Amino acid sequence: MLTRIGGLLRQAESTDNPHEAEAFMEAAQRLATATSIDLAVARSHNASREKQVAPAQRVIRIGEAGKKGLRTFVKLFLVIAFANDVKCDISQSSTQVFAYGFDSDIDTCEALYSSLLIQMVRASDTYIKSGAYRNETAVRTVTETIGRKKYKRQEVVVVAGVTARLNFQTAFAERIGKRLESVKQEAETKAIEEESRGAGTAVVLRNKAIELKDFYTSTSKARGSWRSQSANAGYSRGARAAGDRAGRAARLGGEPELGRGSTQLGR
């Protein structure tokens, strides 16, 4: 399955036509979803509980502690995981993600993430170097303390490069998530309508979701919540729009084989 997906991703990478690239990417996600359904049906037919494949936990390394922008990297992995039936916990430092799911689904997530991470960073670098964000202003709320009282006021500021980058990458990840989820839903709907697999596909998918939820609940030790952006992160409308466009045009692949490639960017 990964080899076939790899072929689709290489086709997406090699074409200069954005519509073809999008079609190949969606085909890759469609194949991943169809394979995931087939494996779920196969598991439901396995009468031997001892040999039945079960969900597992895997640690995904995102980056080194202190590295800027890790939250948007995590955000990208999360949207990919959501579209591929994988639940996640995030370390407080955002340096790693704990992925919960079936091995084949986690493999798909790692493959997609490795390709899209590079594209997201390259696209945001190009945007920042263009200087387009420097023409944009934003309204920032500032809290001042005078005596014993605190006052809030708003001021207009020029969008900083770090703010533009974070907004760009956040919008990129959100658009990718929407694209992958749309393809997944279409593939699942088609499989349920066809019902040619000999088993109630809808029931199988529901049982898979329940099994994963039970595994996650019994295994996860996560406490608290995680935010994709810090509380003081600014907002850039222009960077968001640019990131969304890049997410629409994103291609996958570029690797000779799909597998567990590196999920960290070298610097």
Question: Residue ranges of each PLM-predicted region?
Answer:
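Terminal, compositionally biased segments used for targeting/anchoring and flexible tails
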Residues: R10, L31-A34, R43
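Extended, helix-rich structural scaffolds rather than catalytic motifs
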Residues: M1, I37-R267
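Short, charged, low-complexity amphipathic alpha-helix
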Residues: M1-E22, E26, A40
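Short amphipathic alpha-helical coiled-coil/interface segments
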Residues: I5, A21-T35, Q169-I176
